[in-house]
């Protein structure tokens, strides 16, 4: 890496200004202190953290922490526009990721899906040279390959996101946010941001590898080096799958074991009576899940099952019996931020609620006892999208509430069961799932 580029990147990092969002307004150190909030910046190893102490004597809403740098004429990072590339990481597997250049606009989204594709959809801009990323953002000099990557290496409590603005001379604005989503910050309480780190490397790939290694170490990532090999019902039968379809394929794979040495048979969406009532099958699966798992095992395969654990359909027994377990609106009734087939509305289980955590532990413990060794958890991002809703725990962020629910799922399913996360915010899954 050239001394010039390295010194410019060091200037960017050292010039970051720390801010805190209190009741929907951003404050620097001095303005925060004047209002009774002690904001401090520190290093955690090679990472940066911000801490706020509420000394105001009143409860407030904590929007998050921000590191910011700006300077027109490429004042943040001077790399000529024709050489500068921005790598954008997506929030989930269904969010776009890739490289943008000066003159481009951000990736386009279906407006109806935007709230499931971005942590902060209200900040999306289709203007040229305005870009947003989740988890990590990188700046590359495509002439030399040299790269600076900014990424959050912890992610259990808050969502990490980024934005930047380019001009013809380079990066004019850069922002990294550790999002607290309006969680309660009580008088006398302290909250610490997630850890923000920077990685300079001779290539984007090298920077990504260093970031991933550090992120995985800090979050105790689970390591499985042999990917599971199996058959999934979704990609042929979709939601029309029947019990006899599963049995037919089990027999076929048993007869062709040498040609197709699979380990798992996964039943996907289509068996459940309603979202939320996962142990009760519809009429297409007359013998039930326990019986089916036993039939799969007798044939020499491991049973696997699809669920969307945070989603609860409006016609489910779970919603009728426990509406208070859902994320609540201002009238203390369930929010319905999503929809399902045949016009059914979907409420979202509140992962911050201890009763929901107990429900998850019991559900996944039962599935394991019934013989399922693998679960695919789908539509997981819905567990973080609450709109105007509020959590049982007012101090929980969206990220923390989601992870609490996922921790309970892991506890119930056991350390040796394989959990696949699907359409989930990557950061909050690290350390709890085996694949994504």
Show which residues each predicted segment covers:
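Polysaccharide-binding surfaces and accessory modules of carbohydrate-active proteins
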Residues: 3-160
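Short alpha-helical segments and helix-capping/turn motifs at coil-helix boundaries
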Residues: 6-7, 134-135, 176-179, 249-251, ...
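Short, solvent-exposed loop/edge-beta patches enriched in aromatic
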Residues: 44-46, 55-58, 144, 255-261, ...
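Residues within well-ordered beta-strands of beta-sheet-rich folds
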Residues: 49-53, 194, 230-232, 302-306
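Generic detection of long, well-ordered alpha-helical segments
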Residues: 59, 201, 205, 239-247, ...
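Beta-strand-rich recognition/accessory modules
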Residues: 113-227
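An acidic-aromatic substrate-binding cleft motif
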Residues: 208-264, 268-273
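Aromatic- and carboxylate-enriched substrate-binding clefts and catalytic-loop regions
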Residues: 259-436
């Amino acid at each position: 890496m050239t001394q010039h580029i390295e010194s410019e990147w060091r200037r960017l990092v050292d010039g970051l200004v720390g801010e805190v969002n209190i009741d929907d307004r951003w404050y620097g150190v001095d303005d925060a202190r004047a209002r009774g909030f002690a904001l401090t910046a520190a290093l955690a190893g090679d990472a940066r953290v911000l801490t706020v102490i509420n000394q105001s004597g009143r409860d407030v809403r904590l929007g998050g922490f921000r590191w910011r740098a700006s300077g027109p004429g490429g004042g943040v990072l001077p790399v000529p526009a024709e050489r500068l590339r921005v790598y954008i990481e997506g929030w989930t597997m269904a969010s776009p990721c890739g490289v943008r250049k000066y003159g481009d606009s951000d990736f386009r989204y279906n407006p109806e899906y935007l709230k499931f594709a971005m942590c902060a959809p209200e900040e999306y801009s289709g203007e040229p040279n305005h870009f947003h990323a989740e988890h990590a953002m990188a700046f590359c000099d495509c002439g030399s390959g040299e790269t600076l990557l900014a990424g959050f290496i912890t992610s259990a409590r808050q969502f990490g996101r980024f934005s930047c603005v380019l001009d013809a001379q380079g990066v004019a604005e850069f922002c990294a946010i550790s999002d607290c989503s309006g969680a309660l910050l009580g008088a006398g309480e302290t909250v610490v941001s997630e850890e923000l780190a920077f990685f300079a490397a001779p290539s984007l790939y090298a920077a990504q590898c260093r970031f991933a290694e550090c992120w995985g170490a800090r979050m105790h990532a689970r390591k499985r080096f042999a990917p599971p090999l199996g058959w999934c019902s979704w990609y042929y039968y979709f939601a029309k799958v029947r019990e006899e379809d599963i049995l037919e394929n089990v027999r076929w794979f048993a007869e062709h074991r040498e040609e197709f040495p699979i380990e798992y048979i996964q039943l996907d969406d289509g068996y459940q009576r309603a979202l939320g009532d996962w142990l009760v099958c519809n009429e297409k699966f007359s013998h039930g899940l326990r019986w089916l798992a036993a039939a799969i095992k007798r044939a020499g395969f491991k049973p696997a099952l699809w669920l969307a654990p945070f989603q609860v359909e409006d016609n489910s027994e779970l919603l009728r019996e426990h509406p208070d377990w859902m994320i609540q609106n201002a009238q203390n009734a369930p929010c319905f931020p999503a929809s399902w087939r045949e016009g059914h509305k979907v409420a979202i289980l509140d992962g911050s609620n201890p009763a929901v955590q107990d429900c998850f532990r019991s559900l996944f413990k039962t599935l394991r006892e019934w013989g399922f060794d693998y679960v695919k958890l789908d539509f997981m991002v819905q567990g973080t999208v609450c709109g105007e809703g509020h959590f049982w725990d007012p101090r929980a962020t969206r990220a923390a509430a989601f992870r609490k629910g996922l921790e309970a799922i892991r506890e119930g399913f056991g350390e040796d069961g394989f959990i696949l996360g699907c359409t989930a915010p990557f950061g909050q899954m690290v350390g709890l799932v085996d694949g994504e």
